[in-house]
């Protein structure tokens, strides 16, 4: 979009209407040229040079036609972008159905969550873990993602600011309400088989959901998670939460470790011992709290792996196999 720097002119769309999805621009200093990257959930990135003001394509740099054909040949069900409710608030979401989907049956759900203000999961864009999500859907699950309040999406000031000092509270509330509304809208969703998983901030929200709403979420996989917000780095945490000294109650309410005694379902904790972003002490402190409260869980630690848990031969495959195995064993797949 573009708008005049001065005056009250209308905002005008620049990106082509026929290209539904996400657009990125690397502008020239004069503003007359740009490297334009376009993609959506089923279209790999198309990169061309465009001229302004007409947004005219003057040179194709990469069309990724082969990748697009290969993806289409897989015959996967596309992501469906939908709306769900959290009270009076409308949330964006998507779902992926298995290729042998039968609308007369009820399917278990795996929710992919991030939930923190630094990013967003509901985007019509190429990648974002799509092939892994498709793989799990075709094991017999409905894979979904719901964008809660505060996520990094263009929904206005109040949407972004409302979670200040409250990171971790509104997000788990919205995830809980959102998935229950989705189950009401779509009879093929089995509300008795709901799983949730996330990495980093998403791992934290997985824990908050499992601990705070144990009647809604039955199985969770939390990866590289922050258990206590006081342990995370100041430049991120204090940006959204103020300081622990000024907002002790917010830090307490937003930290999963506060609610560990609420665990009722199946929980897998995964963390790299060499995580220099979310330090491993988060995992150790949560484990001690769960043990103290007599809560049963499963834990996988990857020695000297970082926050991404992808170092050393075989790690990524082992991690994904571990996750798939846990889902299949603890959240029975398939329509019933």
Which role fits each region the language model picked out?
Residues 1-3, 210:
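Short beta-strand segments and strand-loop junctions that repeat across beta-rich extracellular domains
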Residues 8-16:
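Blade-edge beta-strand/turn elements of extracellular beta-propeller
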Residues 15-16, 22-336:
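Serine-hydrolase catalytic core recognition
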Residues 4-8, 52-54:
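Short loop/turn segments that connect beta-strands within beta-propeller blades
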Residues 1, 11-12, 224:
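Long hydrophobic alpha-helices with heptad-repeat/coiled-coil character
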């Amino acid at each position: 979009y573009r708008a005049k720097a001065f005056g009250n002119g209308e905002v005008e769309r620049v990106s082509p209407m026929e290209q539904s999805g996400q657009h990125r621009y690397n502008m020239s200093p004069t503003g007359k040229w740009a490297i334009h990257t376009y993609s959506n959930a089923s279209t790999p990135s198309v990169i061309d040079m465009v001229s302004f003001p007409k947004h005219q394509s003057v040179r194709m740099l990469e069309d990724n036609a082969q990748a697009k054909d290969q993806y289409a040949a897989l015959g996967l069900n596309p992501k469906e972008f939908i709306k769900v409710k959290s009270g009076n608030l409308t949330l964006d979401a998507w779902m992926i159905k298995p290729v042998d989907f039968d609308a007369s049956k009820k399917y278990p759900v795996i929710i992919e969550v991030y939930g923190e203000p630094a990013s967003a999961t509901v985007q019509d864009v190429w990648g974002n873990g799509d092939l892994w999500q498709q793989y799990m859907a075709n094991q017999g699950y409905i894979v979904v993602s719901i964008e809660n309040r505060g996520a990094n999406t263009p929904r206005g000031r109040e949407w972004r600011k409302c979670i200040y000092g409250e990171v971790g509270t509104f997000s788990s509330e919205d995830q809980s309400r959102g998935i229950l509304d989705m189950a009401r809208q779509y009879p093929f969703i089995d509300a008795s088989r709901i799983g949730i998983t996330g990495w980093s901030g998403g791992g934290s929200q997985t824990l908050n959901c499992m601990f705070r709403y144990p009647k809604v979420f039955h199985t969770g996989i939390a990866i590289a998670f922050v258990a206590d917000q006081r342990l995370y780095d100041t430049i991120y945490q204090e940006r959204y939460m103020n300081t622990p000294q000024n907002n002790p109650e917010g830090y307490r309410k937003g930290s999963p470790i506060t609610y560990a005694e609420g665990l009722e379902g199946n929980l897998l904790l995964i963390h790299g011992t060499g995580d220099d972003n979310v330090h491993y002490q988060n995992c150790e402190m949560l484990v001690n709290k769960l043990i103290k409260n007599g809560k049963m869980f499963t834990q996988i630690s990857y020695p000297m792996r970082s926050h991404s848990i992808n170092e050393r031969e075989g790690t990524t495959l082992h991690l994904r196999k571990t996750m798939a195995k846990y889902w299949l064993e603890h959240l029975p797949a398939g329509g019933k």
